[in-house]
Structures are given as C-alpha cells and as structure tokens.
Amino acid sequence: DDWAIIIGGDSHTRMSKGVAFGADSGTVALALATGEVTMPIPDSVKVTFKGSMKNYMDFRDVVHATQAQMLEQCSENVFQGRIIEVHIGTLLADQAFTFTDWTAEMKAKASICISEDATLIESLEIAKTRIQTMIDKGMDNSENTLNGLIDIANNRIKQINSGEKPALAPDENAKYFAEVVVDLDKIDEPMIADPDVYNEDISKRYTHDTIRPISYYSSKKKVDLGFVGSCMVHKGDMKILAQVLKNIETKHGAVNFKAPLVVAPPTYNIVDELKEEGDWDILQKYAGFEFDDDAPKGSARVEYENILYLERPGCNLCMGNQEKASKGDTVMATSTRLFQGRVVADAEDKKGESLLASTPVVVLSTIPVSYTHLRAHETRI
C-alpha cells in the first residue's frame, strides 16, 4: 500500500511504493505492543531527472550517479538523515527497490519513489500474480492472509481507478531541504561504488561516497570474484544475466569464466518464473554448481573455482555471515555492502575490497572478452 507508514528494524528493503523508516529493536517492539511510536520526521530532499537514459546503461548506474551528482551539486551529503523523494513516476516496484534499497548507503533515513497511477496499478497486478503463485503452492495459512493481501490490492486498484484515492503524491506547496537534479545525459558509462581501501585519508575508506566511472580503472582492475544477488537485484537482473550469456555465446561460441560468478536469485518464485520463460536454461547450461534444497551444502563456501554458481535465493555474500570470498579478494558485486570484512576480509598482504556495480558490469568482469572501451559494453548488452 503506497499510503502505508511502516516501521521496521531492517536497514534495507525500504518500501519502494510506501514510506519505511528503520528503527532500533526496542522502538519496533514498542510499536508492536502499543500501535504507536514517536519518531522525529526529517526534512525531505527532492530528486528529479532530466535528459535521457542511454539504452545500454543500467538503472543501477542511475542510482550511483544520483549520489555522485548530489555530492557535486551540494558539496555535502544533503541526503544524510533525511528522506529522499524520487520523482520518476514510471518505475515499477521491482525497479524502485533498486533505488530505495540504496537508501541506507546514501545515509538517508528513508526514501520513496513517487508513482504515476498507471504504474502503481501495474506494480499491484504483478504483486497479485506472485501472491497467487504462493497460494497455488499451498503457502497460505489458516487465516488466508495471502488471499487477504490480494483483496487489499484489488481494493487499492479500485480506489485509483475511481479517483477516490490516487497514488501518493507530494502537496503542491511541499517544501524541501534541498532539490537535486540528476542529468541522465551525463551518465554515459557504468558507475562503480568503490570502497577506496587505500585512500590515505582513512575516514574516506568504505564510505559509499566514492563513485567512479568504469573508465577510471582503464581495464586494469583484476576481479577475483563476481556476485549477482542481494536486495538490489530483481527478476529483470536475472533476465539481463541470461541475455548477456546468450549474446556472448552467439558471438564467441561459448562462455568461459576467468573468475567465479556467484548468482543468488531474489526468490524461489522468480526462479520458477525464469524457468517458465526459458531464461533459467542458459544459467543451468553454464552453472558448475546449482543449489539443491534436497541435498544442501554442509558448510559455507570459502573457496571458489572459475565457474558460475547458482546459489539458493537469499542474501548470500551480502549477509556476511554465510558465504564469503577468499581473504584479500577483489569482489565486483551488485550488493550494497562494501564495508571492511563484510563480503571479503583482508589478507595479510592485501586488503579485501568489494566494488559495487550493475549486473552487466559484474557479469562481464568475470568473462574474458574484449572490454576495453564503452562500445564493447554497449555491444555485450
């Protein structure tokens, strides 16, 4: 429900169509016990966009560029401790999560993607389909909670269509702490969030504020492991992964990995959808490992071969207490975590680092194909 005010203890998975505020466990417990909570509501920062997104760029690059252009325009992080109001009305919920799940990394309190009526309805219809799939699998409870969610979605769609309650929108006279305008025309190459582990100023390491274009690395950055997963990815990312593999196979005859690529799909239902739509086939074709819930691994993996790993849906490497990369590795990941020791720990002779990027960049960083200029990236995508 885009009108819901939600309080929770998770630093990520901010609601893409509602407003969600992270809180400590005690505050959440108080809200559950009393139905009320006292929280200071910070100012908002309005983010609008101009220009056009190039067809070979990924929305993840827009998210990173938003942070970089904000710092350039404002000279300081105006998102910190505030609410980010994203004005792209045509973002479906899956895409919107790519922005709102980066909220914590922008140091903001919360964020919301303003939605047009038609887009909100489409997001609700997608949600209904996925909930129905869960019901068909026998996942509803005795109180029919999942069926109740479909009823809520249908009622919300009715409210929008009738004009009784359109999609949530700011007041015409809304006031903002600051306004940031993101120029999409300036985003002409993939953007990387770099932990900058060797910065002489220790305070500038592991901050998420160092956003660099891929050309900064001049194709000289060796990637030891790639990871596609976490709350930053959705079904579309899995389809992009499948299509990139198909494109490379068509041009080169086969796909060979120069580094391990770990893939953790968002949900089991999405895995089923990918199977129905044919995208899972090529992932299976090149997978050296595929998860099997009937024969689970006995322990977390800490050593990897140069193959594609299809892991079970979940946080995987991003969680930090499940799988881990080898100490001292350079990891290219779609996740949100670049903190020291989270995804990869330091080795005695080399710092571990987790660079964050879009799904296409992560995939291509593990495959030995020519990737020395932007045109190569455009062709692969």
Stretches found by the model and what they are:
Residues 27-38, 62-76, 99-100, 206-216, ...:
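Structured alpha-helical segments in the cores of large, soluble enzyme domains
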Residues 8, 48-50, 85-87, 224-229, ...:
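Short glycine-rich or small-residue beta-strand-to-loop segments that form or flank ligand, phosphate
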Residues 34-74, 269, 273-275, 279-280:
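A structural-propensity feature for long, helix-poor, extended segments
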Residues 1-4, 9-11, 40-45, 78-83, ...:
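Short coil/turn connectors at secondary-structure junctions
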Residues 1, 109-255, 263-289, 303-307, ...:
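Accessory "access/gating" subregions that flank catalytic or transport cores
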Residues 372-381:
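Conserved small/polar residues in nucleotide/adenosyl-binding loops
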Residues 258, 268-359:
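Thiamine diphosphate
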Residues 1-33, 37-40:
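Long, structured ligand/cofactor-binding scaffold of large enzymes
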